[in-house]
């Protein structure tokens, strides 16, 4: 299985202008089978960026608050039970008559979404609703900054009144492909984009890479040993200095989410991004934690146990290839 976002494909085929159904039919006919697609903005209507101007307690409900919210062309009153909002927060607001994709509990999404209408909560009028990630139809596990419960807080520099769905990168379509083993070139977005360019007879534009480096030799810092050339023909390493961990840019997080990869931080996200883009697996290691400053590629021992990132201890066998440092599997 391979997923790509249409916007990511268009980054390399800028003149591509097709509907999701046209894309699906044409790509499948030319041999790149599309199993289906998902429109990320399905049932998301009239949702804008709002800024909370004031908050006061509800006179008749301890768990409700009354917010005055600037939504661009007007100020509206919204009653909410969200525990995590503050004055000055920018939030997604669905206006009267708009739609959200689901409920706040993250359960199955209703086919036609949920219509939002102005009404009264315990006697106080409310003219819209502030949205959680669940209500936007998204999996909060792919939004590292999303609260476990409550409203999703947008970046401080978000423009009040602008399209919140566009801001979150949800005006997009994600396609799922069935890639056969003889087309490993299509296990990356660039391979899919190349196929799309050929299918629709459009210009294919490779991303520009500005390689930077210096005269230092990687071998002065790190050694790589491949002990099994049958399973691993080549292993390459580079050393990157002066790293500062931080969140990756919003555009990168949006593309990763669209293809089913959870954003973590700038370093992990860059390696996952390149993997999704080129189909080339990558991994970043902390140099200071790499015993002997060495990478050893070898088969696992029969019955060897290894705890993976999900916290599960797995029993390995000799047909599994492992990456180790000088002392242990990493």
Task: Tell what function each PLM region has.
Residues 87, 117-136, 216-224, 231, ...:
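Aspartic protease
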Residues 51-79, 271-330:
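Conserved mixed alpha/beta core segments that line enzyme active sites in large multi-domain catalysts
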Residues 49, 91, 232-293:
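Duplex nucleic acid-engaging cores and interfaces of nucleic-acid transaction enzymes
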Residues 174, 251-260, 316-329:
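Short, hydrophobic/aliphatic alpha-helical segments
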Residues 2-216, 330:
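Phosphate-backbone binding interfaces of nucleic-acid-interacting proteins
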Residues 160-179, 219-258:
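Residues forming anionic-ligand binding surfaces in small-molecule and nucleic-acid pockets
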Residues 62-65, 102-114, 141-144, 189-190, ...:
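Short acidic, glycine/serine/threonine-rich loops at helix termini
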